[in-house]
Amino acid sequence: MSEQKPVQWASKIGFVMAAAGSAIGLGAIWKFPYVAGTNGGGAFFLIFVLFTILLGYPLLVGEFIFGRRNQTNAIDAYKKEAPRSAWFLTGWIGVAACFLVLSFYSVIGGWILLYIVKTASGSLSGLSQAQYGALFASIIQNPVQTLAAQLVFMALTVLVVARGVQKGIERVSAVMMPILFLLFILLVLRSLTLNGAMEGVKFLLVPHFGDLTPESILFALGQAFFTLTLGVSVMVTYSSYLPKTQNIPRSAASIVLMNIIVTLLAGLAIFPAVFSFGFQPNEGPTLLFTVLPAVFEQLPFGTLFFIGFLVAFLFAALTSAFSMVEIIVATIGKGDEKKRKKLSWTSGLLIFLVGIPCCLSYGVLSDVHLFGKTFFDIADFTVSNVLMPSGALLISLFIPLKISKSELLAEMRNGSNAGKAFFYTWFYLLRFIVPLAIIIVFLNLIGILSF
C-alpha cells in the first residue's frame, strides 16, 4: 500500500490568505472597535500596533518555525521535540481552546447570519437605535432561530474543512479574504464622506495618552496576542503544511500587516459614521448589532452597505472557524485524509452540541449561572483568561528552550535569507520579552496583578 502524500498548501499566497483569515477573526472586527472605544481610541490603537509587532510577530514566527520543522499535528510535534515529557499537553490545550472557542464563536456567527437574512428581507429598516436594541435582544433570546443559525454556521464551516486543505480552506480563504478587504475599503470610503467623519478619524488615529490607563495597556497587550490566533497551536498546524521554500519571516510579517490593516479599516468604517450621527463609540459589544444598523439606516443605500459590512464580518468569522476545526481534524486524523470528512462532520456536530448552552445563555438559560456567569461567559472566560494565555506562554517557553539556536536559524533560513542580527533579535524577544509580557497579561486576567 502506497503512503499518502503529505498535505501541503498549493501556493505561498494561499497559505498567507488562510493564515491571515485565521488571525483576522471576530477579534479584529467584533472586539477591537468597542475595546478601543472604551480605552482611549488612538492611544490604544498605537499601543496595540506596537505590541503586535514587538510581541505578536516573534511568537507567530516561532509557531511557524516549530510547525514546519515537524510537519505534523501539534501534539505529535511536541512529542517529537520533547519525547517522554508532558510538553505534548500544550498541544492539547490548543485543541481544547479551539473546541471551546468555536462553541460560543459559532453563536456569534449565527447572529451574523440572522442579521444578514433580516436586513436583506427589510426587517431591519426604519427603526431607531432603541428599537434596534430591542430587536437584537429578541433575536438572541429566540432559541429556535439562534440554534438554527448556529447550526448553519457550523455546517458552512465543516463543508469547507471537509474538502481538505487545498480544495477547501485554501481555495475558499483565497476568495473570501480579498472580498473582505474590498468590502471594508468601500465601507471606509463611504464612511469618510459623511459630515463630521473626521471626528471619528481623530478618535481612532490621534493618540491621547492621558486617556490610557494601566488596564487599557494590558488590554492592548492581550489583543496583540489573541487577534493573531496565537497560543492555541492553530498556526503550528497551518505551518505544518508548509514547504521548505516558504519565507517564514516574510509570511508572518504579511499576516501581521494584514491583521493591523483590517483592524484599522474596521475602525475607519465604524467610528466616522458613529461620530457623524452623534452616537457614542463606547457602546460595548452591542455596537455592531444596535448602533451600526441605526447609523446605516440614515445613509443613502444604507441597507446595501450594512449587508456588505455583515458579509465581511461573516467571512472573518468563517475563515477563523476553519482553522479551529482543522486543528481538531489534524490532531485526531494524524494526516489520514481518508478520515477527514467523517472527522470534520463529527467535530462540527460535537462543537454545536457543546455550544447549545452558550447559545441559550441569552434566552431560556439566562437565569442559569455558575460562579456568577452564564454558560457563554464561562466558555469565553475559560478560553480568553486561562487556555489562550497559558498556551501562548508554554509555546513561547518551549521553542527557545527545546530547539537549539542553530536548528532554529537553519529552519528560519529555509526559504529566506534572514541574517544573524534579525535572528538573534527575534530569538531573545521570544525567549525573554514575550513570556514576561504573557505572564503580566495572565496575572492581570486572573486577578492576581492589578493596577
Curated annotation (Swiss-Prot):
Bilayer-crossing regions: 13-33, 41-61, 97-117, 142-162, 174-194, 217-237, 255-275, 299-319, 345-365, 381-401, 429-449
Subcellular location, record wording: Cell membrane
Primary localisation category: membrane
Keywords assigned by UniProt, alphabetized: Cell membrane, Membrane, Symport, Transmembrane, Transmembrane helix, Transport
CDD domains reported for this sequence: SLC6sbd_Tyt1-Like
Superkingdom classification of source: Bacteria
PROSITE patterns from the UniProt entry: NA_NEUROTRAN_SYMP_1, NA_NEUROTRAN_SYMP_3
Membrane topology, from the record: Multi-pass membrane protein
Any one GO molecular-function label of the UniProt entry: symporter activity
Pfam families assigned: SNF (PF00209)
An example Gene Ontology CC term for this record: plasma membrane
Function text: Putative sodium-dependent transporter.
Stated family: Belongs to the sodium:neurotransmitter symporter (SNF) (TC 2.A.22) family.
NCBIfam families noted in UniProt: Na_transp
The name this protein goes by in its record: Uncharacterized sodium-dependent transporter YhdH
Source organism per UniProt: Bacillus subtilis (strain 168)
